[in-house]
Swiss-Prot record:
Its EC number is 7.1.1.-. Its cofactor is [4Fe-4S] cluster. One of its GO terms (molecular function) is quinone binding. This is NADH-quinone oxidoreductase subunit B 1. NDH-1 is composed of 14 different subunits. Subunits NuoB, C, D, E, F, and G constitute the peripheral sector of the complex. It is an enzyme of class 7 (translocase). The gene is nuoB1.
Amino acid sequence: MAEIDPTQLELERQGILLTTVNRFYNWGRRSSIWPMAFGLACCAIEMMAFGLSRYDVARFGAELFRASPRQADLMIVAGTVTKKMAPQVVRLYNQMAEPRYVISMGACATSGGPFRDGYNVLRGIDLLIPVDVYVPGCPPRPEALLHALMTLQEQIDRQKLGRVRWYGSGDKPQTGDFPVPTFGAKGLEIDGKLVDPVGGLPLLSPYTSPSHGEHRSGQIEHPEVVRQFPIMDPEVELENALKARGIAPEIAADDLKRSVVNDA
């Protein structure tokens, strides 16, 4: 065990603490994380419980849920992100001041969850904005979200001012807004280009960890191929196998059943 410098010990007794700029700045940021009051689906109910007195999130300085993105620095994406809602999520993220962080709460926000093969659900919010911490579960318990907050604090403690994207010394800080998609007739579009078609596969790769510069990984999780799903019910026959592309077999079977059900 290293011995404590007697000079430093004497200074601490007099109320003088020696530290670095990075450590002092990170201490201030991690001790005052203000989440945005923003919920999408059932995970938001667990997020509400997370903010109640039972879990005492005030211990970590994150008890002030703000109703405006201008006053928040943490977005908790709690719930299913539909393709119609995705542009609003990106717009809210762009309105948050730097430094800003994102926690993807639950299976739906992370990868689409049980609605992954649905025509209207985004397969992970990290396709559009960078995510700092992922919380698995459907839905995650408040304790899991509390652990995600602690994990985020640990990440903040390891940051250095000279390397984060939103701080620049000489060069311009990289604080540009992320492109806001538009929901068109064929799906999500960015700058007029289709990036996530309705009922199809996403054509853009997710963002890597913000600690690596928030660049896209360059790898598309699902290559653009024609998938032919088997139908679970042998009584259901597909006239065209391509009709089930991008749809789970159960959904395809149910859709076909509805078209042949008799009223009698």
